[in-house]
Curated annotation (Swiss-Prot):
Functional summary from the UniProt entry: Involved in base excision repair of DNA damaged by oxidation or by mutagenic agents. Acts as a DNA glycosylase that recognizes and removes damaged bases. Has a preference for oxidized purines, such as 7,8-dihydro-8-oxoguanine (8-oxoG). Has AP (apurinic/apyrimidinic) lyase activity and introduces nicks in the DNA strand. Cleaves the DNA backbone by beta-delta elimination to generate a single-strand break at the site of the removed base with both 3'- and 5'-phosphates.
Family the entry assigns: Belongs to the FPG family.
EC numbers: 3.2.2.23, 4.2.99.18
GO biological processes: base-excision repair
Assembly and interaction partners: Monomer.
Reaction equation(s) it catalyzes: Hydrolysis of DNA containing ring-opened 7-methylguanine residues, releasing 2,6-diamino-4-hydroxy-5-(N-methyl)formamidopyrimidine; 2'-deoxyribonucleotide-(2'-deoxyribose 5'-phosphate)-2'-deoxyribonucleotide-DNA = a 3'-end 2'-deoxyribonucleotide-(2,3-dehydro-2,3-deoxyribose 5'-phosphate)-DNA + a 5'-end 5'-phospho-2'-deoxyribonucleoside-DNA + H(+)
Zinc finger (FPG-type): 240-274
Species whose genome carries this gene: Halalkalibacterium halodurans (strain ATCC BAA-125 / DSM 18197 / FERM 7344 / JCM 9153 / C-125)
PROSITE patterns, A to Z: FPG_CAT, ZF_FPG_1, ZF_FPG_2
Tagged with keyword Zinc: yes
Protein name, entry field: Formamidopyrimidine-DNA glycosylase
Length: 274
């Protein structure tokens, strides 16, 4: 599933392609993706004539800011956007097409059909699900070591599970939680409330450093991820633990271990992380 670095990269690359374009028509081939409004025909009607003014992101959600509405899109496992000429053939698994007035169209493709779209009156999107109860943004001024300490101290869950909770901090998934915990030398199965203040301070910086580096490298292309211009990310080449089960730790030479924490595959070094 695309995490913060991947969604942020999609936001940036799509912004270069679609800002200023006006939607003339919307075609929906898989109605179950449209979660709001309930009526797909209304979804299409409301978007007609709307111009994309800016692109935003909230956690793992992509936001299209239009004249009067905000389209909130979640890519889920394998969703992707791409800009095409209208006369180009439509690929299999293309489920939503936003047809513009300049001969181009934005296509949403999703092999597994897990992606979702919600349309809100501008300004309402932050007040209602799926955005209303999301936690702090890692790159915001509100995300401090003190805040992270307070939130982790209030949960009895393991640190890996706590960091995956989008109500605590948004944008982190399996990849970047594993990587940040490795950099902070914290074992993923430790209880969050038992992590010391000093350790949380290191973890806070590890989260920021990991996400910043990943964004700068366009995210991680583990499976099918590409950005809005069809380009792969490069951060997968720097992964220390994620996806490296059995390979040697770059710090100590111990084979990387994979276990399951909270139902999620988890990679770590049994020597470096305590």
């Amino acid at each position: 599933m695309p995490e913060l670095p991947e969604v942020e990269t999609v936001r940036r690359t799509l912004a270069e392609l679609v800002i200023g374009k006006t939607i003339e028509q919307v075609d929906v081939g898989w109605a179950k993706m449209i979660k709001r409004p309930d009526d797909v025909d209304q979804f299409k009607w409301l978007l007609k004539g709307q111009t994309i003014r800016s692109m935003g992101r909230r956690g793992k959600f992509l936001l299209f800011h239009l004249d009067d509405y905000t389209l909130v899109s979640h890519l889920r496992m394998e969703g992707r956007y791409g800009l095409y000429q209208q006369n180009e053939s439509v690929a299999k698994h293309t489920h939503v097409r936003f047809v513009f007035g300049d001969g181009t169209e934005l296509r949403y493709q999703d092999v597994r059909k897990f992606g979702t779209m919600h349309l809100f009156q501008s300004g309402r999107e932050q007040m209602e699900p799926p955005l209303a109860k999301l936690g702090v943004e890692p790159f915001s001024d509100q995300f401090s070591a003190k805040l992270l300490t307070e939130r982790l101290s209030k949960t009895s869950r393991k640190i890996k599970s706590a960091l995956l909770d989008q109500g605590i901090i948004v944008g982190l998934g399996n990849i970047y939680v594993d990587e940040a915990l490795f950099r902070a030398r914290i074992h993923p199965e430790r209880l969050a409330k038992d992590v010391t203040v000093a350790e949380v301070k290191i973890l806070h910086q590890a989260i920021l450093n990991t996400l910043t580096e990943a964004v700068n490298l366009g995210g991680s292309s583990i499976k099918s991820y590409v950005n809005g211009q069809g380009e792969m990310g490069m951060f997968q080449q720097r992964l220390d633990v994620y996806g490296r089960k059995g390979e040697t730790c770059r710090q100590c030479g111990t084979p990387i271990t994979k276990t399951v924490v909270g139902g999620r595959g988890t990679h770590f070094c049994s020597v470096c992380q305590k």
